[in-house]
Amino acid sequence: MAQGILGKKIGMTQVFNEQGELVPVTIVDVAANVVLQQKNVDQDGYQATQIGFCDKREKNTSKPMLGHFKKATTAPKRFIKEINFSSDVNSNLANLVVGALITNDLFQVGDLVDVTGTSKGKGFAGSIKRHNQSRGPESHGSRYHRRPGSMGPIKGKLKGKKLPGHMGYETVTIQNLAILSIDTEKNLFLIKGNVPGPNKGFVMIKSAVKKLTKEQTHAKN
C-alpha cells in the first residue's frame, strides 16, 4: 500500500529496542498534514495527492497560492509535495477529501519507509572531498597534488564531469528505514538511523519501494 506524509526533523536520540540493544533514532514531527489537491489520470494525466505542511504567513504567499489554499480551507503552507502512486495501487490518501487532515495512523510500527530530504550544504569543496577522488603524487618534483585533472575538450566541459563546486544541499533519499515507535499524542515518528538534512529541515516519508529479503532485513537489523 502506497502511503506518504510530510514532516520536520527534530533531532536524533537513542532508544532501547525489545532485545535491549541501544539503537540510534531520528525524531520527525508529522503534525498538521493537510490534503491540498487530489490529482487523477483523466484531468492531470497521473494520480497523486498534494500535501501541505507547516503554516506560514499570508503576506509571504502569492495571490494564486492563496486561492489554492482557500479551496482547501486551510492556512498557507510552507512545504508542499505530491505523493504519486499508480491507479492500480491501493492508497488511503486517494480516499481523503481536499482539506482533510492526515493522521499518523497511515503508518504502523515496523513499517519500512523511504525518507527524502535536502542534505546539509557544505560550501565550496574540491574534487577529493566532494567526489572522493584520489590525490596525486607528493614526491619531490611533483606539482600535481589535489587538482581535478583533465577537463576534456578545450571549449566547454564534458557533461557530468566531476569537478570542484558546491558540496551538499542536494535532494537525498535514504531507503528502507524502519519506524521503531509512533507517539500518537505528539505526532512524532521515531525512525531508525539518520535521515537527510539538518534539524528543523523538512522531509518526505513514503512507503518503501524496494522490499528487502529476509537475509537483508536480518543484516540491516
Swiss-Prot record:
Protein origin, superkingdom: Bacteria
Intrachain S-S bonds: none
GO-annotated cellular components: cytosolic large ribosomal subunit
InterPro entries hit by this protein: Ribosomal_uL3, Ribosomal_uL3_bac/org-type, Ribosomal_uL3_CS, Transl_B-barrel_sf
Residue ranges of the region described as Disordered: 123-156
Keywords: Ribonucleoprotein, Ribosomal protein, RNA-binding, rRNA-binding
One biological process term in Gene Ontology: translation
Listed PANTHER family: 50S RIBOSOMAL PROTEIN L3, LARGE RIBOSOMAL SUBUNIT PROTEIN UL3C
Protein family according to the UniProt entry: Belongs to the universal ribosomal protein uL3 family.
NCBIfam families to which the protein is assigned, alphabetical: L3_bact
Role, per record: One of the primary rRNA binding proteins, it binds directly near the 3'-end of the 23S rRNA, where it nucleates assembly of the 50S subunit.
Quaternary structure, from the entry: Part of the 50S ribosomal subunit. Forms a cluster with proteins L14 and L19.
Name of the protein in question: Large ribosomal subunit protein uL3
Protein species of origin: Aster yellows witches'-broom phytoplasma (strain AYWB)
Gene: rplC
